[in-house]
């Protein structure tokens, strides 16, 4: 199967509530990840696989996507947009774009997954098995937090299981699928439908659909939480996660054009510094994601945290495992630890939040 005869469908309609306050101003797939909108990494992988036609299924802040990617020509793609008037779920989102499909086969992606899967190999697997649906599956250390997808010795899916304390397999749904058009046409239109909880179990129960699982051992991460977002960004910077959108040397830091890093600042752990950001002397950034226009003043320590657009971090502040919203102003010597989230534009005075008594 030639990849140019395949459509790509990317579902990007979610509100990204677990990443608030960052997603109050931008959809999750548009947040800077290793200095680029996250979706750029996925679209670059799609283009590198030879797929040309992409449909973005949008809902939350849809105009942001078209403003960034336009017709897709800058990435070597042809991008079209379909907006949901109300949330339709994963299955409903697929059905909603059916009118834009040009081919009999479509590869569908959840737009918040960072993956290194070989897309051409996945399509070859689908074709060689003459499958109606193929799911990319990954193995995880603790599958109890996920729904499981067991397969038989011929790689055919035998069940779709909800979260359980005693899962029979470590294989989980990786959020990437290959559909034949005749299956997409069976998905109900105009209402919310879950592909995981409704479409796939119904197809399996009917018994007339060949559903296969492609077990993949490449890099995979769901970017839905601050912890995973930070880790995924750092893995891109360090070259652990692949992306055709990132060129050049990978290492402990990625400093984008227009950023200013003072002598004596230490940037490690896959830290990324956005355009126009200023990093003061004596600072220590370890696994930090610094968006464009941020000012980090002297002596700050920022670890495994995300600092939103245009925020200011005052001298000797400590931020660990936190999320700072766009335009927030964190005063000198503040300490924000373990899950702290500061909303956009909030001002914290010098020493306003401390976890220790020394000042």
Swiss-Prot record:
Q: Give the catalytic activity.
A: alpha-D-mannose 1-phosphate + GTP + H(+) = GDP-alpha-D-mannose + diphosphate
The EC number(s) given in the record are 2.7.7.13
Which domain of life does the UniProt lineage start with? Bacteria
> Is Electron transport one of the keywords UniProt gives this record?
no
- One example GO MF annotation: nucleotidyltransferase activity
Pathway listed: Cell wall biogenesis; Nucleotide-sugar biosynthesis; GDP-alpha-D-mannose biosynthesis; GDP-alpha-D-mannose from alpha-D-mannose 1-phosphate (GTP route): step 1/1
Q: Which UniProt keywords apply?
A: Cell wall biogenesis/degradation, GTP-binding, Nucleotide-binding, Nucleotidyltransferase, Transferase
BP GO annotations = cell wall organization; GDP-mannose biosynthetic process
Q: What happens when the gene is disrupted?
A: Essential for in vitro growth. Knockdown of the gene decreases the cell growth and alters the integrity of cell wall and cell membrane.
Which Pfam family, any one, appears in the UniProt record? NTP_transferase
Query: SUPFAM superfamilies, from UniProt?
Result: Nucleotide-diphospho-sugar transferases
GO CC annotations, alphabetized: cytoplasm
| Entry's pH dependence statement | Optimum pH is 7.5.
As for what it does, the entry says: Catalyzes the formation of GDP-mannose from D-mannose-1-phosphate and GTP. Plays an important role in the synthesis of different glycoconjugates which are responsible for cell wall structure, virulence and immunomodulatory activity of M.tuberculosis.
What more is known? Answer: Could be the potential target for novel anti-tuberculosis drug.
Record-linked PANTHER family: SUGAR-1-PHOSPHATE GUANYL TRANSFERASE
Family membership, please give it.
Answer: Belongs to the transferase hexapeptide repeat family.
> Protein name, please?
Mannose-1-phosphate guanylyltransferase
Organism, as annotated: Mycobacterium tuberculosis (strain ATCC 25618 / H37Rv)
State which gene encodes it.
Answer: manB
